[in-house]
């Protein structure tokens, strides 16, 4: 909540909050012309709300935007959001992956199914990137465009990655973690 309500506005990013207990249609009513994505949790924190992932995915795709699902609480063992139409799934490493709040980090998993070029809302993935000699992530990387952009640009420029020592002490498999 704090990320969307307090931190992102400092960067000019607006968030529209909806009451998920009112059903999936509230998501459609909140979509504006500049909406970039829909973001839900498989199990809402702190109220344990459950959302129809498939219905929200249909709404998002109808409007040419991806559905991002925070699956931290449910874990991939219990819920696999890609099977219901999610485009990106995120997990907080602080909770179940790291164990007891000793790890500050997260995991981003991209289904590779969302067409980032179709809606015209994601020029940073479609247009030539001068810092990568004109590479277009959608054209040159294809299905892995988003997650490659996160790794190649966001991690490079913002440094949001686990330290080698912390990664080594994590009980999770280490290959491919960001």
Regions found by a protein language model. Give the residues of each.
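PLP-dependent aminotransferase-like
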Residues: 1-42, 58, 62, 76, ...
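Glycine- and other small-residue-rich loops at beta-strand/loop junctions that grip anionic moieties
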Residues: 16, 45-49, 69-71, 159-162
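Fold-independent oxyanion-binding glycine-rich loops
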Residues: 18-21, 40-43, 65, 69-72, ...
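Active-site core of PLP-dependent enzymes with the aminotransferase class I/II
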Residues: 43-66, 74-80
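Active-site PLP attachment segment
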Residues: 86-148, 160-167
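A short glycine-threonine-serine/GTX helix/turn-capping micro-motif
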Residues: 149-162, 174
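Conserved small/polar residues in nucleotide/adenosyl-binding loops
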Residues: 168-173
């Amino acid at each position: 909540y704090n990320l969307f309500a307090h931190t992102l506005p400092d960067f000019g990013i607006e968030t529209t909050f909806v009451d998920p207990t009112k059903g999936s249609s509230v998501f459609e009513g909140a979509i504006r012309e500049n909406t970039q994505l829909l973001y839900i949790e498989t199990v809402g924190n702190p109220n344990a709300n459950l959302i129809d992932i498939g219905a929200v995915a249909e709404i998002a795709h109808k409007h040419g935007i991806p559905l991002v699902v925070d699956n931290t609480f449910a874990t991939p063992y219990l819920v696999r959001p890609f099977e219901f139409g999610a485009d990106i799934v995120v997990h907080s490493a602080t909770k179940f992956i790291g164990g007891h709040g000793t790890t500050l980090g997260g995991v981003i998993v991209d289904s590779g199914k969302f067409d980032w070029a179709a809606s015209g809302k994601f020029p940073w993935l479609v247009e030539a990137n001068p810092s990568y000699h004109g590479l277009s992530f959608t054209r040159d990387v294809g299905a892995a465009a988003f997650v490659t952009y996160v790794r190649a640009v966001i991690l490079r420029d913002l440094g949001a990655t686990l330290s080698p020592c912390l990664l080594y002490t994590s009980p999770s498999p280490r290959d491919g973690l960001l």
